[in-house]
Design a protein with these regions (language model features):
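Alpha-helical structural signal in soluble globular domains
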Residues: 22-26, 45-48, 82-86, 105-113, ...
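Short beta->alpha connector loops
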Residues: 12-14, 72-75, 123-125
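Short, well-ordered coil/turn segments that N-cap beta-strands
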Residues: 29, 65, 88, 115-116
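Hydrophobic residues in well-ordered beta-strands that form the structural core
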Residues: 15, 55, 92, 117-119
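A contiguous active-site-proximal alpha/beta segment in oxidoreductase catalytic domains
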Residues: 98-136
């Protein structure tokens, strides 16, 4: 069975703390590389995790089945729209977008392209949230 090819967009603290340590060690998929507009900072992160740095979003997307988006919320709409236009499945950290209309457009586009569009809350199972849920 062919391994799922994934990429990462945005290499800030969330990507570095919560995602890259797992994505770079798992054998069930192939981490193709990453893209970030801040290429100098991205180079340091990619070197640390031994992954390829792409200079263009399109170049990364064309080699991936799915992309994790960890960029600034203000960029989510444009980044996700472009990825869906390139027929790539998308996982994005919450929130999907800053405006409900943009979120609705992306959901419609994902449906049209028959691509997965998932919004994650990476602390859902943290001890604090689990305790709070239990107390409620």
């Amino acid at each position: 069975m062919r391994k799922l090819k994934i990429g990462v967009v945005g290499l800030g603290s969330i990507a570095q703390k919560a995602y890259l340590p797992i994505l770079t060690k798992e054998d069930n998929w192939e981490l193709i590389g990453a893209f970030s507009p801040n290429q100098s900072k991205a180079r340091l992160v990619c070197d640390r995790y031994r992954i390829e740095l792409f200079s263009r979003l399109d170049s990364l997307a064309q080699q991936c089945d799915a992309v994790f988006v960890h960029s600034a919320t203000a960029s989510h709409y444009e980044v996700i729209k472009r990825l869906l236009d390139l027929n790539v499945h998308v996982y994005v950290d919450k929130p999907l977008t800053e405006q409900i209309e943009q979120s609705e457009q992306l959901i419609e586009l994902a449906d049209l392209r028959q691509k997965g569009l998932m919004v994650g809350f990476n602390r859902r199972f943290s001890p604090f949230y689990m305790a709070l849920k239990y107390d409620l």
